[in-house]
Amino acid sequence: MKTSKTVAKLLFVVGALVYLVGLWISCPLLSGKGYFLGVLMTATFGNYAYLRAEKLGQLDDFFTHICQLVALITIGLLFIGVLNAPINTYEMVIYPIAFFVCLFGQMRLFRSA
């Protein structure tokens, strides 16, 4: 149990650091850095809100659909931002993977608690 929680924390932190530090170095403008930080914060908040409501047993169809809509919009914004950012091709693959690793680690961390 403790090992899975440690792995979940590690996934969350490493995913967030690779995503944020990599894009911080790659994006020359502060607005681009803020854009990618906002995308990550929106995704982690939506993920947290859904998991918390699920844990408390307060899920209904409307809330689930809102969380799915926020997730789809956030993922769309991530891919549009990555495609328009002045980064290399391999970075266009690494940063979305780090984004999803961060969200997966957050989900595993919340469910292991």
UniProtKB/Swiss-Prot annotation:
UniProt keyword terms in alphabetical order: Cell inner membrane, Cell membrane, Membrane, Transmembrane, Transmembrane helix
Cellular compartment(s): Cell inner membrane
Keyword Transport listed: no
Main location: membrane
Mode of membrane association: Multi-pass membrane protein
Residue ranges crossing the lipid bilayer per the database entry: 10-20, 34-51, 62-82, 85-105
Cytoplasmic side: 1-9, 52-61, 106-113
Residues in compartment: Periplasmic: 21-33, 83-84
Domain of life: Bacteria
A GO-annotated cellular component: plasma membrane
Keyword Cell membrane: yes
One Gene Ontology term from the biological process aspect of the record: DNA damage response
NCBIfam families (UniProt xref): PRK11403.1
Name of this chain's protein: Inner membrane protein YiaB
Chain's gene name: yiaB
